[in-house]
Amino acid sequence: MLTGVRFLLAVAFALLCAIVYVPAQGPAKPHVVFVTGDDEYRSEITMPMIAEILERRHGFRTSVAYARPKPQTKDNIEGLEALETADLMVIYTRFRALPDPQLKRILDFSKSGKPMIGLRTTTHAFLYPEGSPHASLNDGFGRDVFGQKWITHHGHRSTTEVTIPEGQRGHAILRGVEPFHAKSWLYHVTPLHGTGNTVLLEGRSIHSDKIGKTDQFPLTQPVAWTRSYNGARVFFTTLGHPGDFESPSMRRLLINAIFWALGREVPEGGADAEPVTPYKAPETFDLSKVG
């Protein structure tokens, strides 16, 4: 009888060990939330394309928040509740005046210490009227969180040659990223706000409308950098024209930055950035074609 009891105890102990020591099947899928709301550069099209790459090629979980009922709607972005479970926020908005509950979700995330990525017009993500309690965000959000507010650009007829500054080639975000020609017109951003900004890419304006004013608005400016905010890793790029995303280097830059911001190892040679669905850049200004 004693032998039988010992046997049963041994079996029970073995089962308990099996339960306790089952190896993990890998980390949980990172949840990346894309906040869109820039009808000028069609972030409602470009960001879902990046989200699809993350899901299908890298096993991430993604959510996309959209301006509703149409991309031009400035006072409503639906889907922001996804930020409650997000590991990282990618925000690409322009001149929004969101109601308090929606704004609070974005601001709460920005203060959470979790990583963030911003693109182009997020230097001027919000536009609240004078006298609004949120008017300080018009300049303050882009400046304080991402390193600069809206200042000016080099003209809608210009383009940008993107290069890697000397000494930055070895940065993980730049794995597999080569110099490329961007359709984005160059933003003036210097001097960047605060300390701890690391410039990863520079752009030189081609056919700038600031010729004659280059002492004030130099033809070369940072176009991608890293920094920290509330202890979180932050990446920002002033690129983001829909035509830029036809470049593998632009897509890889953003996906590498997502890996880096999450503290994940960027693959040697850079992350797979091939679109899952063939991508053709939409027009930027023909807003009648926006759904």
Regions found by a protein language model. Name each.
Residues 91, 96-176:
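A glycine-rich, often tryptophan-bearing local segment used as a flexible ligand/cofactor-contacting loop or short
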Residues 6-20:
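Bacterial N-terminal signal peptides
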Residues 29-35, 39-125:
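Helical hinge/lid and interdomain linker segments adjacent to catalytic or ligand-binding clefts
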Residues 55, 61, 73-74, 84-85, ...:
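Catalytic beta-strand/loop cores that center a nucleophilic Ser/Cys/Thr
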Residues 45-49, 101, 105, 168, ...:
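Extracytoplasmic/secreted proteins, especially bacterial periplasmic and envelope-associated proteins
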Residues 1-5:
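N-terminal secretory signal peptides that target proteins for export/translocation
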Residues 26-30, 45-46, 56, 207-291:
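Extracellular ligand-binding/catalytic regions of CAZymes and related secreted enzymes
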Residues 37-40, 157-162, 240-248:
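Active-site rim elements
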